[in-house]
Amino acid sequence: MSENRQLRLGTILHGASGNMSAWRHPAAQADASINFAFVTQTALKAEAGKLDFIFVADGLYINEKSIPHFLNRFEPLTVLSALAAITRQLGLVGTLSTSYSEPFTTARQFASLDHLSQGRAGWNVVTSPLEGSAKNFSRAQHPDHALRYRIADEYLQVVKGLWDSWEEDAFVRNKETGQFFDKNKLHTLDHHGDFFKVAGPLNIARTPQGRPIIFQAGASDDGKKLAARHADAIFTHQDSLAEAQAFYRDVKSQLAAYQRSPDQLHIFQGVSVIVGDDAEDAERQYQTTAALVSIEDALNYLGRYFEHHDFSQYPLDEPFPDIGDLGQNSFRSTTDEIKRHARERGLTLRQVALEAASPRPRFTGTASDVADGLQLWFEQHAADGFIIQGGTPETFPRFVDEVVPLLQARGLFRRDYPGTTLRESLGLALPANQFQK
């Protein structure tokens, strides 16, 4: 792996930033998840800071106990297409589930976004952890964890094949001869698999990036295997430097099985940060935002990870209850981590719920403190980059204005974009067309 590494940075649209109740903060845009002016402001701020991309999460099921900004938010591809017309170099990464969509449509949508943005599209691949999603797609039941990842693996094979339908110079458009395309540079997929039968070809040209960037969000064994085979980047979260280093080594070591080098997959840690005038100011900001979360809301938030389990039935100030293997078919890696930390630290249900609903930011303090933390994790091979979430509604602008210049001054982060595409920003080579001889 090359040691001439450059830190990569993205940010995530996550309501008003901060915790689930941050919309109540005096400085918050209460309708941030559905306010395009706010979304535009955030994207332009990210681009001014030369960040690699903006990331839009998504979900396919809500109920009355869902996180407030999940109840009312933009569909990712739609809002990213709008941002494509406003931004010029910022990458545009959107979430779409392989469990409740079709490969042909997905390939076409992200290829269109890549053309609209002139090469800045990214797809965050998820398999949908919530059982309720099935109810919105005329399905009798939600696929189990292992099956979802088998479907995702074949789905990605199909999508990548469709993206390779056309060679780069297939469209001749010769007005004199009347030749619109070179038929020798058109390739039909004709896929027949366990889950999908897709003929192809795709009805849009090969994209500026060859293929849009593929992100994968998931830290289970199945998720890591899927990323090692197909992804350009992985979005993950570990609580400690040691855990992040172990994850980093594990994922990178799996790439060789697919004839890939460690540099071909970037690992992004999702981190919350707070930038303050000093440590006391940063702590005050955290406590102000944390105080907005009620224990009732925290229990609902915790329950979402465990298939919307009702935690209100248990005593709050006794040890976290034994709930068996609940969560294995939803957010498996997250629920395993929650149960492990509760057991190892002897936490009560109240403590677990409040920590989950308003987690303490990973990097907090002055701008220099935050930059130090990011630098340590990067240089110690715990991450290739970070997806930044503001720990309060006021944080992200300060991160761009104060932390990014420090990272640039230290030679860790570039001062300008290296090109116009997300692939160029991430330092990833153009993929070969699998059908081209």
Model-derived regions, located:
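N-terminal beta1-alpha1-beta2 module of alpha/beta enzyme domains
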Residues: 1-86, 209-212, 436-437
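Acidic (Asp/Glu)-rich catalytic clusters
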Residues: 2-4, 47-48, 80-88, 114-120, ...
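An alpha-helical appendage that flanks or caps ligand/catalytic pockets
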Residues: 2-17, 146-209, 242-245, 249, ...
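Hydrophobic faces of well-ordered beta-strands that scaffold small-molecule active sites
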Residues: 7-11, 54-56, 90-96, 119-125, ...
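Conserved, mostly hydrophobic/aromatic
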Residues: 9, 46, 50, 83, ...
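Active-site mouth loops of central-metabolism enzymes
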Residues: 22-37, 95-104, 140-142, 208-221, ...
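Alpha-helix-loop-beta-strand connector modules within alpha/beta enzyme cores
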Residues: 67-93, 256-258, 399-415
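Hydrophobic or amphipathic alpha-helical targeting/insertion segments
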Residues: 86-87, 91-137, 143-146, 151-155
